[in-house]
């Protein structure tokens, strides 16, 4: 049986994990967190992509959205603003789990609205970097 293929997709400013607002996002870099995920899921082919550019995130969704088994997507601030990302997720077959490191409902009111949730199979947030692990487990259980 072939390995399941899952993309971990991060949006704007998530390239600064480990440096940016550690009180909210923690001290771990995404490289460190991704290495931990690879160790935790040795039977899954995990890929990682990050962009600060909305169009590049859309292109990546289109690129893998008909061949991968799942996408773990932290759209960052685009979560609250991007109809285009919602539409890109709706346009593909691959299930997408929306992920947030922080509990967005304990933060600013504008973060309480997600424009992509309706296109995703589920949402996981508030568990720090462990939110990514939980999302992968959810995708594997589908």
PLM segments and residue spans:
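Short beta->alpha junction loops
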Residues: 47-55
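Short acidic active-site motifs
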Residues: 56-60
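Extreme N-terminal starter segment of soluble prokaryotic enzymes
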Residues: 2-6
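Short acidic/histidine-rich motifs immediately flanking catalytic phosphotransfer sites
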Residues: 64-71
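Short Gly/Thr/Asp-enriched flexible loops that form oxyanion-binding sites at enzyme active sites
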Residues: 82-91
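Short glycine-rich anion-binding loops that position phosphate/pyrophosphate groups of nucleotides
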Residues: 12-14, 76-79, 102-104
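Short, glycine-/small-residue-rich phosphate/pyrophosphate-handling segment
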Residues: 47-48, 97, 106-142
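Glycine- and acidic-residue-enriched helix-capping/strand-helix junction motifs
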Residues: 16-31
């Amino acid at each position: 049986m072939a390995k399941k293929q899952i993309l971990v997709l991060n949006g704007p400013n998530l390239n600064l994990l480990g440096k940016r607002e550690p009180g909210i996002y923690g001290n771990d870099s995404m490289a460190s967190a991704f290495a931990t995920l690879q160790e935790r899921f040795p039977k899954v082919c995990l890929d990682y992509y990050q962009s600060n550019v909305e169009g590049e995130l859309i292109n990546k969704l289109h690129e893998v959205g008909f061949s991968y088994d799942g996408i773990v997507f932290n759209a960052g601030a685009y979560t609250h603003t991007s109809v285009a990302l919602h539409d890109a997720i709706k346009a593909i077959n691959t299930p997408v789990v929306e992920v947030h490191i922080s509990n967005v409902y304990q933060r600013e009111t504008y973060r309480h609205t997600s424009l992509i949730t309706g296109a995703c199979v589920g949402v996981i947030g508030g568990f720090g970097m462990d939110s990514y692990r939980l999302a992968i487990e959810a995708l594997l259980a589908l």
